[in-house]
Amino acid sequence: MLTLIQGKKIVNHLRSRLAFEYNGQLIKILSKNIVAVGSLRREEKMLNDVDLLIIVPEKKLLKHVLPNIRIKGLSFSVKVCGERKCVLFIEWEKKTYQLDLFTALAEEKPYAIFHFTGPVSYLIRIRAALKKKNYKLNQYGLFKNQTLVPLKITTEKELIKELGFTYRIPKKRL
């Protein structure tokens, strides 16, 4: 367990230190492409882990980011890692914490932020209401009859409004 303040410090530290190896080069992940999600974004007082969403600018890079993740100046070990999710244990101030990393393409960003911020109970209610209208919402997009529904949105707030719901800031979601 860690406090909200500790979680924010870890994220601030990581923003300038995340990179991945690609074709023999170390590519820095820009701070603007790192989004805190999960209980940290909901500003819960105590956190089980730190969840970060990494926005990947090009689809061809997607499969390279997490399996080749590097954190400058921070000791870490990989528990499990795939193309879209990686669970790490990081050493921070003489303690070990779990860091969950997720990836999304730029066009998936609002959906991924919504999905990974949660909480699960809130997502279930939104998805149940959408299911009654034959829609499916996940971290990749909005679908009707298994076909992606293109929405002209760039933020989570726009997504919620487009779906016909009232936007709630993450810490007010139940």
Curated annotation (Swiss-Prot):
Its EC number is 2.7.7.7. Signal peptide: none annotated. The keyword Plastid does not apply. GO terms for cellular component: virion component. Changing H115F: Slower dG:dGTP misincorporation. It catalyses: DNA(n) + a 2'-deoxyribonucleoside 5'-triphosphate = DNA(n+1) + diphosphate. Residues 42-51 are annotated as: Involved in ssDNA binding. Its cofactor is Mg(2+). Keywords: Disulfide bond, DNA damage, DNA repair, DNA-binding, DNA-directed DNA polymerase, Magnesium, Metal-binding, Nucleotidyltransferase, Transferase, Virion. Mg(2+) binds at D49, D51, D100. It comes from the Viruses. Changing H115E: 36x decreased dG:dGTP misincorporation. GO terms for molecular function: DNA binding; DNA-directed DNA polymerase activity; metal ion binding. In the presence of magnesium, pol X shows a strong preference for the ssDNA gaps having one and two nucleotides. Gene3D superfamilies: Beta Polymerase, domain 2, DNA polymerase, thumb domain. It holds the Pfam family DNA_pol_B_thumb. The record marks H115 as: Stabilizes dGTP in a syn conformation to overcome the Watson-Crick base pairing constraint. Disulfide bonds join C81-C86. The keyword tRNA processing does not apply. Coiled coil: none annotated. Error-prone polymerase lacking a proofreading 3'-5' exonuclease which catalyzes the gap-filling reaction during the DNA repair process. Specifically binds intermediates in the single-nucleotide base-excision repair process. Also catalyzes DNA polymerization with low nucleotide-insertion fidelity. Probably acts as a strategic DNA mutase, which gives rise to a rapid emergence of variants. Generates mismatched G-G pairs, in that case, the polymerase first binds the deoxynucleotide followed by mismatch formation. PANTHER family: DNA POLYMERASE LAMBDA, DNA POLYMERASE TYPE-X FAMILY MEMBER. Small DNA polymerase formed from only a palm and a C-terminal subdomain. Unlike other polymerases, binds DNA via the helix alphaE. The total DNA-binding site of pol X is composed of two DNA-binding subsites. Belongs to the DNA polymerase type-X family. This is Repair DNA polymerase X. It comes from African swine fever virus (strain Badajoz 1971 Vero-adapted).
